[in-house]
Amino acid sequence: MNSSPPFLLKISAPSTSPQADCPNNYSFPPESPSSCRKGFTPVLTLEVPVAPGKDFNDHLSCNAGLSPNAGNRFTNPPYSREPFSCLTISSPCLPRRIPTPPPPPPVLSSPPPPERCPFEPFSPLLGRLYRQEPAGSSSPCFDRFSLQGSPSPHQRNLCCNYIDSPESQRSCPPSPRLCYVTSPPLIHQAPRASPVTSPELTHITLETGPVISTPLMPGSQGNYSIISPLLTHRPLRPGLAISPPLAHRSVETRPLTPASISHRGPHCPSRRSYNDPPLSSASSPPSGNPYHDNPMPPNSCEPKPQLDVPLGKNGCGPPLSSQAGMSGSPISPQEGCIHYSHLCPDSQISAPRSPFCVINLPPESAGSPSSSLPQALQKPCVGSFLWEPGGNSYLLLTPGTIISGPSCTTGPPLPQCPNPSPYFPSPLNNQCVAPPQSPRGYNEPRPPTSAPPQMKSPKSPESRRNPYKCRSLDNTPHHTPPSHSKSHKTNTCPQPPSQSFGLFSPCMEPAITTTSNSCPKEPPPETAVLKTVAPTSCPHSSPCNPALPSRYPKSSPHVPPPVSPCNTHMYSVVPPTSHLSPLSSPLNQSIPLPQPAVLPCGTYSAPRGPPSHIKSVAPPCSTHIYSFIPLRTPFDPRCLPVVPRARFCPTTVPCGIHTYAVTSPVPLNNPSQIPYSCSLPPSKTSSTCSTSVSSTIVCSDYQSSDSQINHQNKSQSPNKNSSLHNQSKSPLRRGAFQSRSRSRSSSPLQSSTQDRNESTNMGVKHHKRSRKQSQSPADGKIESQSKSLQHRKSVGQIKSPHSKKK
């Protein structure tokens, strides 16, 4: 059995009070000393042998060596003083049970391949979140954990510390995480001949197995807890012990070394750099994995500011921009290993500090063929930390880490998308979030689609970001004949706004629809009812797409209706255009008018392709949601219903104009005065208009002068004229006139009766004064159809009832 490069996992707990972390209710083996009560630091070291030749060499690799001669760190004793800076997990509690069978004992005879520091983050043994079991928890120091599923609601505050300095601790996120930490070399320690890289683990003998116990050898240190099985008859082997066969392939991580040790030269030899060009598919090994070796070693593991060429041939959007810190920060490299195999190569990563992310595989992928691992790696739909209850791959991030960007979504959607349907606004207002599509490796060919090949990279770096691939929904229903089923259209759309969400779901696929600015002169003759389906649920074909298409059902039963894709506009503002009758009101029950079908104004797409015998529905003309008169829509202002006379609008009514018919043709007792009224034609407005106030506009101005009354009245009602003359007779009653003029606008009949009642109570002195005022030149400003006769008649009418009553 060939042994693969070892992998170190250190779980150290800070030494606190003896009784705080380690109560006495935990049962230790009889031969184990009471090191827990003395405040020990448990350490777990693991060696993961994997089958050689099936490595994900294109994956991120860990810091192989902190010295220039990193390839001899496991064979050359002088370099064993340096710590193995690959992974550190600091936790006050250790996993007690690991749901994997006991593997065969490791063989450390064959040396690992040089210049490699492998790491297996996709192990069900290491890469699962710890979840506390409901029963059997013995103590905070040694709790029972199951390594399956999502973290428990009792989140633990772990600490990520260096291997050599446990006092320098940094708080992790609330949930348990795997922290990728590198550490400076321990130069002061003397070299020891041991395969273990850390000097503290030199004399520790470990057994292979998944159960925690504390059998310490006589020569070992007394402040460490060792993972060992219940089978104590197994031969003890010094050094790294646990060796489960995990999917028969190794996954490497590439560390971002701290600035203090960046002067040692290249730390990741024979590994692929960030700016290395994508390898051709001919150079891929026959194992079928999507990661390949790069013959040219990079000069450093530090991330470049931008990846000029994407890592694969899938080509979906802007390239990867790995920023190793905040903007303006002098720290170019970061501590920790960055995993980007789960991301699309054009995603933007911003990790201000170290522990970055962890990817976990489903448990059944341990013995599955080589196709299951890339599928879990490539899953881009990351909604939150715990959106995955089934135990599939997920992503853990630390505070400050932002991942944004599109996803490689070109195939059929996956059913594992997050349960809510998130909707991110876009300039087009019709982008629908789609689930991840057909995860593939970086160098795997794209699945055959109807989309044309993507644009090549232009010269400028800004235009190098290829536009996102957009696929519109099928515009034909499911029962369309084969001759009309070719209605797919692939378009390129502008990029969404470059906003950095906390966890920007990268599975956003905009659906482009065609817009038109031409108004339909008349609705289709065969259109019976047009309905707009509200996007309440997602169709089965696209579980993450919240938009349902709008259908235009036709009256003919044999013709399938066209489907409008991705409807997000549901505001119908098109006026009726199928009749040439004057503008009517909803209160008019006597004139039956045909109610035409109203086309909702929005973004739609007409059926594509030349129709053979089907008359297609003309799309609406407005692309504005809340605009009654769109700017790009020509309209006739004479058709606006704001003039008090009837007009016949032409056949083409501009889209986006509401017809407000507010005039009642029947005289009402208390009609409502609305300034904008559409009256009936002059043939119908007979003497009934004298009592209808809706066709009368009275403008009384009492602020300029007491005796100046501007009266515009075209009716012949004597009551109104007399009331107006009565209002203008006394200059001492200015406030009363103003109040009555206000009330007259609401109910003119009531104010006229009040004036008549008041005029009967007036004396002879007021009549004389009103007669004099009626003969004054101020009365010439009273505008009516007959001035002189009307004044004389009104004065006589005022005089006669008062004289009789007197």
From Swiss-Prot:
Region (Disordered): 1-36, 257-329, 428-496, 707-806
Keywords associated with the record: Cytoplasm
Tissue/organ expression: Isoforms 3 and 4 are expressed in testis (at protein level).
Stated name of the protein: Sperm head and tail associated protein
Ranges annotated as biased composition (Polar residues): 13-27, 320-329, 773-788
Cytoplasm is among the record's keywords: yes
Region (Interaction with CRISP2): 521-806
Upper lineage: Eukaryota, Metazoa, Chordata, Craniata, Vertebrata
Gene that this polypeptide is encoded by: Nsun4
Species of the source: Mus musculus (Mouse)
Subcellular location(s) of the protein: Cytoplasm
GO annotation, cellular component aspect: mitochondrial large ribosomal subunit; mitochondrion
Record's subunit section: Interacts with CRISP2.
